Amino acid sequence: MEMDTVRSYLSRIGAPTPAEPTVEVLRDLHRRHLETVPFENLSIHLDEPIVLTTEALTDKIVGRGRGGFCYELNGLFAELLRALGFEVELLAASVLVDGGRIVTPIFDHLAVLVRLEERYLVDVGFGAHATYPLRVDWPEAQEDPAGEFLVVDAPGGDMDVLMDGVPQYRVEMRPRRLSDFERPCWWQQHAPDSHFRDTPRCSRNTEDGRVTVVGDRLLETVGDHRTETTLTTDEDVLSAYEKHFGFRLAKVPTPPV
């Protein structure tokens, strides 16, 4: 990633250019990213192809001010961290459903490993998740504004991530390339069984909570208080995307047939 792109990316998330790669810088970038670059599946509902290249993701997230899902968000964030001097690896993960009784296929999720004096799990692409990177080699609970997290060993040398006692996903501790995720990314876009095709969704952290648009509903959470507003017209939906995410969409996202 060229330095002009790095500066534009940092401007996108409201971050200064760091002098060196430190854990404090990593935590700050992680929090800012979650507050400014939303987790969203709108490309699927706007008939926009998702292309997993650094150039395409930079155009979408930095140039056009959009968001994306895990492959896009964590894939590009990893490139930013590399350009800033961090030692980074991409990791494939399975999502743990129904308390861990269901384990989805590997490559269902992309996470990032950063090596500093210790290892950190970085994830800006799992929706409502940890605000800050998680310490990989820390056996005790980790308190975070989003909840209590545990990173524990799993069978076969893998690693499980739990949030408030609920299993979230299982990470395979083997370095991957972004191109390794192209086929699962295609599946998430086109397969009838992909849950990303069900409903348009866009969500990001705020300083004191979270804001989400799901279909024709606007959900706003501040602390423990949540409000839900029905967006009754197409204009209401488009206005919500612009007000809360800065998106000027030409049409309302609609589930694919």
Regions found by a protein language model. Give the residues of each.
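Mixed-charge, low-complexity segments
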Residues: M1-G67, R82-I106, G127-P133, P139, ...
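Active-site acidic/histidine clusters and adjacent loop/turn architecture
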Residues: N74-F77
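Short beta-strand scaffold segments in enzyme catalytic cores
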Residues: L110-L113
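Basic phosphate/pyrophosphate-binding loop/patch that engages nucleotide-derived ligands
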Residues: E117
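Catalytic Cys-His active-site segments of thiol-dependent hydrolases/isopeptidases
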Residues: Y120-G127
